Each structure stands twice: as structure tokens, then as C-alpha cells.
Amino acid sequence: MIIGITTTYEEDHGYERANVEYLERIAQAGGTPVLLPPAPGGDEAAIAAAREVATRIDGLVLSGGGDIDPALYEEARLPETVNVVHTRDIYEMALARYAHELDLPVLGICRGMQVMNVALGGTLYQDMNACGLTAVDHQQQPPYDATEQRADVASGSLLARLLCGRPETGMAPGCQ
């Protein structure tokens, strides 16, 4: 089973990178991890490459990284929107759409979940703090190992009902 993993561009150093843990976990589960850096050559090349790649993989991991260009969901960029890489955005949006069309399993990690949302027509809050929605800093710093984040659940909401009135539960051993 071939599982594609998108990469993150390190502009300061001029290379693509991936979290080695993603590769290790896929291999431990019996899969073959394959890194998927964006194709050079502009938007059309990136979209064509995404189409080709999607037909050759059995699953997709859309990894974390910088912000998505707000122009892709028809908004002006805020000063807080950082680390936008246009080629990556176009490539991953196309990958997400083709994976959806082909009914491939997709795991979106942080930015990856946002890519799936925008690729299928959704929008985003560019910056939760700038929009006045939270005082929590959602931008994780190295070593990028935070495994959880607190969320308040509105009483009586669908989520509260799904959680059976227990919005605060403990993490399983080994998941902390």
C-alpha cells in the first residue's frame, strides 16, 4: 500500500522536508511512504502532477506547514498570514480534490485539514487572534510536538451531546 505524504518547503534553506515520524508510522503499519513535493513549472504542471500522483497512491497524508493563500478562498491576505507557498497550495488543493474524486483515504494534519476544507469549497479564519476569536496562540513552535489543545464545548451543542456531557476526557496512555 503506497501512502503519499506532502512535504513542507523550507524557504530559508531551499529544500522540501517531511516529518520522519510520518514515514515511520506508515512503514510500521505496513505501508510504503512516498514523499510528494510540489511539481515545479507553475500551476498547470502542479495540477497535472497531482492528477498523476493521485492515481498511483492508495492513501494521502496532507502534512502541516504554513498558511494557505487566502486568495484561494477569495479573501485578502492579513498581515498575520505567513509562510504562504503558492505552488504547494495549488498542488495540495489539486491532490485533495483528486483524492476526494477517487475516494482515497486522506489524513489531514493541521494545515492538511485546512487544505481539504478549502479544496472542497470551504473558507478559513486566517488568524484566530486577529479575528478576535481566541487569545490562544494556535501557531505551534518547534519541536512541533504538542499533541492536544484545549477546546471549550458549548453546553447543549451537537458536540456536547456527542461527548455525552463529558467535554473533558483524558488522553489514552501513550498518546500524550
Regions found by a protein language model. Name each.
Residues 113:
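The feature captures the ABC ATPase H-loop/switch
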Residues 110:
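Conserved G/P- and acidic residue-centered "switch" motifs that form tight phosphate/ATP-binding loops
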Residues 175-176:
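Histidine-centered catalytic micro-motifs
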Residues 1-107, 117-125, 129-166, 172:
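N-terminal beta1-alpha1 cap of cysteine-dependent amidohydrolase-like domains
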